[in-house]
Amino acid sequence: MTRVVATGTFDILHPGHVLYLSEAGKLGDELYVIVARDSTIKHKRKPLVPENQRLFMVRALKCVDHAMLGSEDDMFKPIREIDPDIITIGFNQHWDEEALQRQLIERGLKAKVVRITKCDTAPYASSRHIREKIKESDC
C-alpha cells in the first residue's frame, strides 16, 4: 500500500487546493494531508481561517483519506508517524525538492519528494488571487 502525504496551509480552500490534493492522491493508495498550524506559518501572512476550520474542510474532501494538523514543535513528527512513500509539494510551495529530500534522508525517512505541477484550468486557483478579487469588489 502506497502512502502519500500532502501538506499545506489551505487557507481559503479553493479549486487549486482540490486539484493539488486530487493529483497527490493519484500517486498512491492512501492520501494523508497535514494542515499547517496557525502558529507555524511564518512565510506568509496569518491565515484568515483558523486551523481547526481549515482541517475540517480538508477532511470533507473525497480525495482525502486522513487529515491532521501539523506539529507545532517538529514539522517532521507527523511524517515519521505516517511513514509515507511519497511526499508531495504544490507548484507554489516554497520547498526546494532536493533540499527537502536531503532533510528526509538525514532523518532516516525514505519518502520520495514529488512536486505537483500547476493546473491552469481553475480560474480561482490561488488564495492570493481570491483575496485580490475580494479587495476589488464592492463588498
UniProtKB/Swiss-Prot annotation:
Positions that bind ATP: 9-10, 14-17, 92
SUPFAM superfamilies per UniProt: Nucleotidylyl transferase
This protein's encoding gene: ribL
Family label: Belongs to the archaeal FAD synthase family.
Protein name, per record: FAD synthase
Pathways involved: Cofactor biosynthesis; FAD biosynthesis; FAD from FMN: step 1/1
Reactions the enzyme catalyzes: FMN + ATP + H(+) = FAD + diphosphate
Self-association state and partner proteins as the record states: Homodimer.
Lineage: Archaea, Methanobacteriati, Methanobacteriota, Stenosarchaea group, Methanomicrobia
Job description of the protein: Catalyzes the transfer of the AMP portion of ATP to flavin mononucleotide (FMN) to produce flavin adenine dinucleotide (FAD) coenzyme.
EC identifiers of the protein: 2.7.7.2
Cofactor: a divalent metal cation
PANTHER family found in the cross-reference section: FAD SYNTHASE (PTHR43793:SF1)
Keywords: ATP-binding, FAD, Flavoprotein, FMN, Nucleotide-binding, Nucleotidyltransferase, Transferase
